[in-house]
Amino acid sequence: MKSGTTPFIGASDSNNGVTAFVSNTNVSKDSNVLGVNYNGSVVENFYHPYTCIFSDDVKRFALREHNGNEYVYLFMKTVILQQKSKYAYGYKFNEERMQKQMILLPTTANGQPDYDYMEQYVKRLFSALK
């Protein structure tokens, strides 16, 4: 890795997962995603609204059918973290388990994820902190 200004996201549980700043690039360059650790600090995850590069130990989680924002991804972060106790050294959180992991989300009347509710919920939490 060459030193630079682009955040490099590793399987860390601190500093929003940023373990270095680099100038090189690769196919893992992304933004507006959750970086979910499946090695190292397992299931720890951070929201990355900025462009960054991800290590092989961090999977990028992006919504397919919805343009996620900070609030929706922070809601998702918490839901994903609730799975942490399930995984340990003997039962590793790998890519296959990550893809099969079921998470419970609020839904609309037609059974679709209620992204508006998720966004408003986090916004209310933020406003309560002010």
Task: Identify the residue ranges that each predicted region occupies.
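DNA target-recognition patches
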Residues: 1-19, 25
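Short, structured motif recognition centered on aromatic/hydrophobic residues
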Residues: 6-9, 58, 72-80, 118, ...
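A conserved ligand/cofactor-binding region detector
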Residues: 11, 26, 42, 66-69, ...
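A short beta-sheet element
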Residues: 20-77
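Catalytic micro-motifs at enzyme active sites that drive phosphoryl/nucleotidyl and oxygen chemistry
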Residues: 47-49, 86-91
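A short glycine-rich beta-alpha junction/loop motif
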Residues: 52-59, 90-109
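Compact, glycine/acidic-enriched structural inserts
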Residues: 61, 66, 83-85, 89
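Amphipathic alpha-helical coiled-coil/heptad-repeat segments
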Residues: 97-130
